UniProtKB/Swiss-Prot annotation:
This is Condensin-2 complex subunit D3. Residues 1487-1498 have a biased composition (Basic residues). GO terms for cellular component: condensed chromosome, centromeric region; condensed nuclear chromosome; condensin complex; membrane; nucleoplasm; pericentric heterochromatin. GO terms for biological process: cell division; meiotic chromosome condensation; mitotic chromosome condensation; positive regulation of chromosome condensation; positive regulation of chromosome segregation; positive regulation of chromosome separation. It is found in: Nucleus. The modification Phosphothreonine is found at T1331, T1379. InterPro entries: ARM-like, ARM-type_fold, CND1/NCAPD3, Cnd1_C, NCAPD3. Residues 155-188, 514-533, 889-911, 1306-1339, 1429-1498 are annotated as: Disordered. The gene is NCAPD3. Its main location: nucleus. It is linked to Microcephaly 22, primary, autosomal recessive: A form of microcephaly, a disease defined as a head circumference more than 3 standard deviations below the age, sex and ethnically matched mean. Brain weight is markedly reduced and the cerebral cortex is disproportionately small. It comes from Homo sapiens (Human).
Length: 1498
């Protein structure tokens, strides 16, 4: 009774006397949707005491809900007895709950709504509520939604606004009136705008937010107390709403401790709303709320957004959340919750978990960070599944990895990486063998990751390769046995690919057999590599795959492939993998900056992993050191960083050196290699040390550390290092250096390298030495030079040191030169004297020492540069005498024009002696040094050097002549300029070394502009692109595209037209190809003829590839005006030479390289994986640009180019020029690209349009015929000796070409001397050589008349048709050249229609009655011999094959036979007339259609 009395007191505010029952009934009738608001006075009465009315009623109802009052007291009886309607209570609760769902609600009303919802839940908790119909699904859902709606939105929390008293929710009573129809969208949007404006005045303090949060917490706790008691099994929509609200609350606030949501605990132990939310989700999963796994499926579906870090809410599209620590924690809690459910529910939940995992894969955000977290979540959940379920999912993942969607294939790799970080599962023997393989890491690497390395999408290939590299790194830390076995230890499979110098281990790291799961499955997935390799069968080789990927067109793929390669090499013995080391060092010069950086990084990592491997040390030096000259500063800095890290930073004092320190040992090993096998890298090191010296990198401590090694086993590298840094660091221990000099110079056979470095150091410190010491060293050096005891390398260093010593001893330049003349004059005199004894005395060469003579000549050249005043003519004569050869008289100067012949003659005194080539080679260098100082000598010597270049057979001599000539070109530019053609001829030298040397030297001269692009030089230079040596061709491409083109961007464009004339050796144009050339030049550089067409096209395409779009646009117009128009207008004659030229021209115009980049490039959608707004904007810009350019290009093409093409076509047809074939091919492409524009263009001349359409149809038929003949070329003849011998392979041509004069027998022409192809033999008909069996054939096919393609085709088709029906053939059977004519009466039998060919291709040739060949068929009405008579059996207009056959069957056949004793009629010119044109109408001039071009270039 106490409880009932308290209930009555609590109900007092909720039972107003003036409450209209109609309002309550309306609320229930409208299902708690919209109704008129509550009377304000009644609302004021309830909330008069604030929350007291809510809390007092709650306290009164609670004992009845919890059962504390006992079983005797019933609340429902009390309601009836006291005339209290529970419907009224629910309606009043609804009023306050509904207010919360509005936007402009104050803190107080939010609290009222939350408490009202709590009262409704409490009333539902009271036993008997269902029977008394307290529950209403809409009211229930609105109370649940209050948990979300009552909390202010983020926009409200973040606004800064003035705090004002919030407006009453009753401000607009009429707004919630029932509406008869749905509101219009405009009204809703206006309402939202008004509400937002009203909402501007609301502000929430921290205290306000705390009150709202506490109210939500208590309401949620009350609701969770209801859930175990109140079944929602029959209320699926309510369950769904509960799940959505609970999931949204999991992200309500951070949970500062680990949340155990499934533990049985009292609700009052929970402290955070997310804890309660997860507990609510757990309660919903109990059987009381639904059977089976329906509820769990709904829960997981909502949890998916939390796991994928997406916004939680309604709608299919959910934006990704910013990746913050709170979002990550929420994801972790969601995964923990699902894991706990799996642990508890076991098998019953496995199917739902598998669906969840698949949905994670399908809906993950395609951004790197989101994919990584999603993969981690997936793997954590997957680890909870038993082996059977795990294997089933991996099987599904394998199929998912072959999805057609790129993001799916990328995410698979993230999942595989995460799986590989876990320990491998033990084999479950209960599984089938088919499923056991899915448990192994080997399957993940082999079947999924490796396959994606061959994916057709570059982003997937790159991701797979980087994953592969990461996988290899995992083997070091986690020691995964399966991966180690896969990459290192498995000896079970054989090597499938080997390369010279490469040892591929017999391990699955390099070759392994694919385990196919089900070959009968349809392969609809993406499984084709970009290189065309089919993925999915056969053996695979990791190293072979990597080599392909390192050459991939995409930068990121190459970069990732390098990472994988280095990861493998780190764990391998590289002794047999030289090719892979070469690949690594070559990638340091990749075109892409990021790849070069990665290659530097990878090589350094490999060297650090195996610091004592000499091969890796050499590869590192060859790869890293040259990059200090890189044009990209960031790459150069990276190379300098690695050099500093490995070379300089590890140099300690010798007393601190010990062999166990890998870093110190490595540093000195690298320096030693730089002084021995890798000396050629010294020039790059000079650049590095120059940069370091500017940064004051070399401290006194560092220098002393280096000096401490000079007397040790590291002496040579230490002196090399000192020679590099001495110039920038004068503070050296001079006494130590002089002591070392005295010690080593007194040795009989000192180390040349070390001695040279010491002399270099002495030269740098000369100005700091005492005068006495300096003079002493000077005398010693001079003495050694006079003694000729040192090697050539030391002589150069000694001369340099001598110059520096004299400079240090002198105070003025004049004094320095005087001192040099005095010191060096003695050495010069000694050289002169020794040479005179050998060269000028009789029998002087008989007992000469070649090595000494070389030293005399070499020393003379170096010393003479320091004292030019002491060099006399006698010395010139001596060097010229050494160069003279007795064979000179046998050679005549090459014809270079009359003006150059005298200059090529050597002076008379340079004849008569014979010297070995090594001496003559050194003499050339010395002569060049002398010429640099003496211009008169240069004038006399240059012609002789040029002649030596042409007649000398020794490679060393020719090489040195080129070097000298190019040096003299810098000193005497004008003098040498006229001999540049002679130098450029060396680009076709027989020796590859000379060709490459010439290429390098000419490139240097062109870069510095000592040589200009004039005459034949450009064409000589580009001919290196087709050099037989691939390295030279590649280097030529580099020089042209990356060095010379950058200095002169229009160079290729300016020379392109002349290239076409020049390489076809066409000299009839008044402007092009008019520079002088000797016959030898023409012979060496000739690319004329069909056999060289492919090489010419390679040059053209290379030039076009490096055009800008503007240049491509202009070159098309320029080609038409400068080449095609000249032939169309009759300015240039149309002959066979012109045919080759035009053939090249049309092939150029048809090539893809001449198409604008903006037109042929497609946006690389593979690169737009991560929703990059900037990338999408660029794609839109590209499309707009492409559309604009297309319009301009089409206009230019239609107005300026098409008229020329049409006019030229007519001329080619008239003259029967073979290039018509290429023109038709080009025209076909044009008609495909500009179909609509051409229709507009030909609208004014329908006759011309009809003719062109007819010609294109005929050309298409010819192409079909060619394909047919190519297929049946081997069955053209018949079997048996008595039958006709087969006609030789028929050249597939568009036209008949007369045999050139003097070529009587076409069988002996070059076109027939080898098997013909359509490309190689166009324009000729090849007939087999005469044999006894071909008598009739020879009579019917005269030698001087090759047949056209159509004639041959008809002969073959008719012959096969007759033979197919004839069993008994006469031995005199011949191939009869008869035709079924379909032309006008004026046409002769040589003019052929495609009638019989069309019949043959359709299989519709009519059968002929058996008869002798000489007997006319009974239906033939006339037989004629050899006359130009034809029987018209086909329509006058082009028609289908069926119509032609019908016309054919209605008439009688005519058989036209050539009279054996009468010569055949001469072939008429082939001219296809349009059916739409009258035969008497003269051909109109198409040139009148051509307009002035939009723009032409020079």
């Amino acid at each position: 009774m106490v409880a009932l009395r308290g209930l009555g007191s609590g109900l007092q505010p909720w039972c107003p006397l003036d409450l209209r029952l109609e309002w309550v009934d309306t609320v229930w009738e409208l299902d708690f949707t919209e109704t008129e608001p509550l009377d304000p006075s009644i609302e004021a009465e309830i909330i008069e005491t604030g929350l007291a009315a809510f809390t007092k009623l709650y306290e009164s109802l609670l004992p009845f809900a919890t059962g504390e009052h006992g079983s005797m007291e019933s609340i429902w009886t009390f309601f009836i007895e006291n005339n209290v309607s529970h419907s009224t209570l629910v309606a009043l609760f609804y009023h306050f709950v509904q207010i919360v769902h509005k936007k402009n609600v104050s803190v107080q009303y939010r609290e009222y709504g939350l408490h009202a919802a709590g009262l409704y839940f409490l009333l539902l908790e009271v036993p008997g509520s269902v029977a008394n119909q307290v529950f209403h699904p809409v009211m229930f859902d609105k109370c649940i939604q209050t948990l979300k709606k009552s909390w202010p939105q983020e926009s409200n929390l973040n606004r800064k606004r003035k705090k004002e008293q919030p407006k009453s929710s009753q401000a607009n009573p009429g707004r919630h009136r029932k509406r008869g129809k749905p509101p219009r969208r405009e009204d809703i949007e206006m309402d939202e705008i008004i509400e937002e404006q009203e909402d501007e005045n609301i502000c929430f303090s921290a205290r306000d937010l705390s009150q709202i949060r506490n109210a939500i917490f208590h309401l949620l706790k009350n609701f969770l107390r209801l859930l175990p008691k109140f079944s929602l099994k029959e209320k699926p929509q309510c369950v769904q709403n509960c799940i959505e609200v609970f999931v949204s609350l999991t992200n309500f606030e951070p949970v500062l401790h680990e949340c155990h949501v499934t533990q049985a605990r009292a609700l009052n132990q929970a402290k955070y709303i997310p804890e309660l939310a997860y507990y609510g989700l757990y309660l919903l999963c109990s059987p009381i709320h639904g059977e089976g796994d329906k509820v769990i499926s709904c829960v997981f579906h909502q949890m998916l957004s939390v796991i994928l870090m997406l916004e939680v809410g309604e709608g299919s599209h959910r934006a990704p959340l910013a990746v913050t620590s709170q979002v990550i924690n929420c994801r972790n809690q969601a995964v923990q919750f699902i894991s706990a459910l799996v642990d508890e529910l076991k098998e019953s939940i496995f199917p739902v978990v598998r669906i969840l995992l698949q949905h994670i894969c399908a809906k993950v955000v395609d951004k790197s960070e989101y994919r990584t977290f999603a993969a981690q979540s997936l793997v954590q959940l997957l680890s909870k599944l038993p082996c059977g379920e795990y294997a089933m999912f991996i099987a599904w993942l394998y199929k998912y990895s072959r999805s057609s969607k790129i993001p799916h294939r990328v995410f698979t790799l993230d999942v595989v990486l995460a799986l590989l970080e876990l320990p491998e599962r033990e084999v479950d023997n209960t599984l089938s063998l088919e499923h056991q393989k899915f448990l192994k890491h080997k399957f993940l690497v082999q079947e999924i990751m490796f396959d994606r390395c061959l994916d057709k999408a570059p982003t997937v290939r790159s991701k797979a390769l980087s994953s592969f590299a990461h996988c290899l790194e995992l083997t070091v830390t986690s020691a995964s046995e399966s991966i180690l076995e896969l990459l290192i230890n498995s000896p079970t499979f054989s090597v499938i690919e080997s390369h010279p110098g490469t040892l591929l281990r017999n391990s699955s790291a390099f070759s392994y057999q694919r385990q196919t799961s089900n070959r009968s499955e349809p392969s609809g997935e993406i499984n084709i590599d970009s290189s065309g390799e089919t993925v999915g069968s056969g053996e695979r080789c990791v190293m072979a795959m990597l080599r392909r990927r390192i050459r991939d067109e995409k930068t990121n793929v190459r970069k990732s492939a390098l990472q994988v390669l280095v990861s493998i090499l780190k764990h391998c013995d590289v002794s047999g993998m030289k090719e892979d080391l070469w690949i690594l060092q070559d990638q340091c010069r990749d075109p892409a900056v990021s790849v070069r950086k990665q290659a530097l990084q990878s090589l350094t990592e490999l060297l650090m992993a195996q610091p004592r491997c000499v091969q890796i040390q050499k590869a590192w030096l060859r790869g890293v050191v040259p990059v200090v000259m890189d044009c990209e500063s960031t790459v150069q800095e990276k190379a300098l960083e690695f050099l500093d890290q490995l070379l300089l930073q590890n140099i300690r004092h010798h007393s601190h050196f010990h062999s166990g320190d890998d870093s110190q040992v490595l540093a000195w090993a690298l320096l030693t290699l730089l002084t021995t096998e890798s000396q050629e890298l010294s020039r790059y090191l000079n650049k590095a040390f120059h940069i370091w010296s500017k940064k004051e990198k070399f401290s006194p401590t560092f220098i002393n550390n280096v000096i401490s090694h000079t007397g040790t086993e590291h002496s040579a590298p230490a002196w090399m290092l000192l020679s590099k840094i001495a110039g920038s660091s004068p503070r050296l221990d001079y006494s130590r250096i002089i002591q070392s000099w005295e010690k080593i110079s007194s040795q009989q056979n000192p180390n040349s390298n070390t001695l040279g470095h010491i002399l270099c150091v002495i030269g740098h410190i000369a100005k700091h030495l005492p005068k006495s010491t300096r003079d002493k060293v000077t005398d010693a050096v001079k003495c050694k030079l006079n003694g000729f005891q040192w090697s050539l390398e030391v002589i150069s260093s000694a001369v340099d040191a001598l110059q520096r010593l004299c400079r240090a001893s002198a105070e003025t330049p004049a004094e320095e030169q005087e001192l040099l003349t005095q010191v060096c004059g003695d050495v010069l005199s000694t050289c002169e004297h020794r040479l005179s004894n050998i060269v000028l005395k009789e029998n002087g060469t008989g007992n000469m020492d070649e090595d000494l003579l070389v030293k005399y000549i070499f020393t003379l050249g170096d010393i003479a540069q320091l004292c030019p005043a002491r060099v006399e003519k006698r010395i010139f004569l001596l060097i010229q005498s050494v160069l003279a050869s007795s064979a000179d008289a046998d050679h005549s100067p090459s014809s270079q024009g009359s003006s150059e012949a005298p200059a090529s003659q050597p002076p008379p005194q340079v004849r008569g002696s014979v010297m070995p080539s090594v001496i003559r080679a050194h003499a050339i260098i010395t002569l060049g040094k002398l010429c640099l100082q003496h211009e008169d000598l240069a004038k006399k010597s240059i012609p002789a050097l040029v002649r030596e270049l042409e007649v000398c057979e020794d490679v060393a001599v020719r090489n040195n002549v080129i070097i000298v000539m190019c040096d003299l070109c810098i000193r005497y530019t004008i003098m040498v300029d006229k001999y540049i053609p002679n130098i450029s001829m060396c680009l076709k030298d027989s020796d590859p070394f000379i060709r490459k040397q010439t290429l390098i030297l000419l490139t240097n001269l062109l870069q510095e502009e000592f040589v200009k692009w004039k005459g034949s030089l450009f064409f000589r230079f580009v001919s290196t692109l087709i050099d037989s040596h691939p390295d030279i061709a590649s280097f030529g491409e580099f020089c042209l595209a990356h060095l010379l083109l950058k200095r002169n961007p229009v160079m290729f464009f300016q020379h392109f037209i002349e290239c076409i004339f020049h390489f076809n050796n066409y000299e009839k144009h008044e402007k092009y190809n008019k520079f002088p050339q000797s016959e030898r030049e023409k012979r060496l550089f000739s690319l004329k003829g069909k056999s060289n067409k492919e090489r010419r096209m390679k040059i053209y395409k290379f030039l076009l590839e490096h055009f800008t779009d503007e240049q491509r646009f202009n070159i098309t117009s320029k080609i038409c005006l400068s080449i095609l128009a000249c032939f169309a207008d009759g300015i240039l004659p149309l002959d066979l030479d012109a045919s080759e030229l035009l053939s090249d021209t049309f092939e150029v115009l048809s090539s893809k390289e001449i198409k604008l980049l903006a037109m042929r490039s497609k946006p690389d959608k593979d690169l737009l994986m991560e929703e990059d707004d900037m990338a999408l904007a660029n794609v839109v810009m590209q499309e707009a640009q492409k559309k604009l350019i297309s319009q301009v290009q089409k206009r230019n093409f239609i107005e300026n180019i098409i008229p020329i093409i049409i006019s030229l076509k007519t001329v080619l047809e008239k003259n029967k020029i073979p290039a018509l074939r290429e023109l038709m091919h080009y025209l076909r492409e044009v008609m495909q690209d500009y179909r609509d524009e051409l229709k507009d263009f030909f609208a004014v001349d329908k006759q011309l349009a009809s003719e062109l359409e007819y010609d294109m149809k005929k050309y298409q038929e010819q192409l079909v015929q060619e394909q047919e003949l190519a297929k049946h070329a081997d069955v053209a003849g018949t079997a048996g000796g008595a039958e006709v011998a087969p006609v030789a392979q028929v050249a597939l041509c568009l036209e008949t070409v007369p045999v050139p004069a003097g070529q009587e027998n076409p069988a002996m022409s070059p076109a027939v001397s080898q098997p013909c192809t359509p490309r190689a033999s166009a324009g000729h008909v090849a007939v087999s050589s005469p044999t006894p069996e071909t008598g009739p054939l020879q009579r019917l096919l005269p030698k001087a008349r090759p047949m056209s393609l159509s004639t041959i085709a008809i002969l073959n088709s008719v012959k096969k048709a007759v033979e197919s029906k004839s069993r008994h053939r006469s031995r005199s059977l011949g191939v009869l050249p008869f035709t079924l004519n379909s032309g006008s009466p004026e046409k002769t039998c040589s003019q052929v229609s495609s009638y019989s060919l069309e019949q043959e291709s359709n299989g519709e040739i009519e059968h002929v009655t058996k008869r002798a060949i000489s007997t006319p068929e009974k239906s033939i009405s006339d037989v004629t011999f050899g006359a130009g008579v034809s029987y018209i059996g086909t329509p006058r207009t082009p028609s289908s094959a069926k119509e032609k056959i019908e016309g054919r069957s209605q008439g009688n056949d005519i058989l036209c036979l050539s009279l054996p004793d009468k010569p055949p009629p001469q072939p008429q010119q082939w001219n296809v007339r349009s059916p739409a044109r009258n035969k008497d109408t003269p051909a109109c001039s198409r040139r009148s259609l051509r307009k002035t071009p939009l723009k032409t270039a020079n």
